[in-house]
């Protein structure tokens, strides 16, 4: 496969090329390294927004509404909808365009579902690479919608420039969000389904929780709370405005560059740990491991020292 040609086609906005590149990184193709090397100098221009929240708060509807708002403003949009994996096929349960079919024919929108494959953080393990593909393909904004199953969703903060936490009235979402720890990661909070009873109370509860223990210095970002009815498009422009303000604030204070460096560090660590696991997995039956195991079993060596020796042998340190 001609990777440079495929990357060039993706830069031109050809959906099939984008899809092929994402499939290559998602499937851990032997050409993965070549693909990532070709993409690296083409990335950094897209604004990555993560959307998370409990099931039923309207994440998909909100994502679709945001896509519409960004397209009206002339921005190219990429969407990664991270879905639960099917225990039978290992694929995403929901199709790429099932929930956002109104945008399927828009050449300025690329939508892709990715399976979590059991990853505890809710994000597909290949999501960071897929974000790079969409970035290189010229997307101005990339929306990453995660599974939303509780505490594990905190990982979205490691992948997004801005994290949006969605809640809905009458669900005790404020309390649940506090328990799950996602109140600590939100840059913008959205109370969706605001036409229902209890929306104002939910917003007040959320505001109270955010203010508890708050000790922000002058000029620090204070997460806004926006009420929406995404199904009717109400409040979506206000969400976009809040996102634009947060991006401007981050750029002014150097926070955006700092977050992206942290994201790159997290990605490097993940790749390195995965590589070490694979090398350790290859040691089954290896004489070094067998010899160390025998010493530990005989009480000649403790398992921590044995582990240090094993790692030193793998890394050459």
Model-identified regions with their sequence ranges:
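Nucleotide-state-sensitive switch-loop elements of NTP-binding domains
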Residues: 2-49, 54-57, 63-152, 156-174
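Short hinge/gating elements
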Residues: 4-7, 114, 189-191, 224-229, ...
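Generic secondary-structure signature for well-ordered alpha-helical cores
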Residues: 12, 23-30, 41, 72, ...
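Generic beta-sheet signal
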Residues: 80, 166, 191-192, 228
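Alpha-helical scaffold elements adjacent to nucleotide-binding pockets in ATP/GTP-utilizing enzyme cores
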Residues: 93, 130, 155, 159, ...
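Flexible active-site lid/hinge loop adjacent to a nucleotide/diphosphate
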Residues: 169-197
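Canonical P-loop GTPase G-domain recognition
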Residues: 188, 194-249
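Long, well-ordered amphipathic alpha-helical subdomains in the mid-to-C-terminal portions
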Residues: 227-230, 238-315
């Amino acid at each position: 496969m001609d990777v440079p040609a495929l990357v060039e086609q993706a830069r031109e906005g050809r959906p099939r090329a984008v899809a092929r590149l994402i499939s290559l990184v998602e499937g851990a193709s032997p050409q993965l390294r070549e693909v990532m090397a070709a993409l690296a100098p083409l990335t950094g221009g897209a604004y990555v927004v993560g959307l998370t929240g409990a099931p039923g708060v309207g994440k998909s509807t909100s994502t679709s509404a945001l896509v519409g708002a960004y397209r009206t403003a002339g921005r190219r949009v990429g969407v990664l909808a991270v879905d639960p994996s099917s225990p039978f096929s290992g694929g995403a349960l929901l199709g790429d365009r099932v929930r956002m079919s109104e945008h399927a024919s828009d050449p300025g929108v690329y939508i892709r579902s990715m399976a979590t494959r059991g990853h505890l953080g809710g994000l597909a393990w290949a999501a960071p690479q897929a974000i790079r593909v969409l970035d290189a393909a010229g997307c101005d904004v990339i929306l990453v919608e995660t599974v939303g199953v509780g505490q594990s969703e905190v990982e979205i903060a490691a992948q997004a420039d801005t994290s949006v936490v969605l809640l809905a009235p009458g669900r005790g979402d404020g309390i649940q969000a506090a328990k799950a720890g996602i109140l600590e990661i939100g840059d913008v909070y959205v109370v969706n389904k605001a036409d229902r009873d209890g929306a104002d109370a939910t917003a007040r509860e959320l505001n109270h929780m955010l203010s508890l223990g708050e000790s922000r210095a002058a000029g620090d970002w204070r997460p806004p709370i926006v009420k929406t009815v995404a199904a009717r498009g109400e409040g979506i422009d206000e969400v976009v405005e809040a996102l634009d303000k947060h991006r401007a604030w981050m750029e002014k204070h150097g926070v955006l560059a700092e977050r992206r460096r942290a994201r790159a560090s997290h990605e490097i660590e993940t790749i390195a740990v995965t590589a070490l696991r694979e090398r350790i997995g290859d040691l089954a039956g290896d004489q070094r491991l067998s010899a160390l195991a025998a010493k530990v079993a005989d009480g000649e060596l403790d398992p921590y020292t044995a582990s240090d020796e094993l790692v030193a042998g793998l890394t050459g340190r």
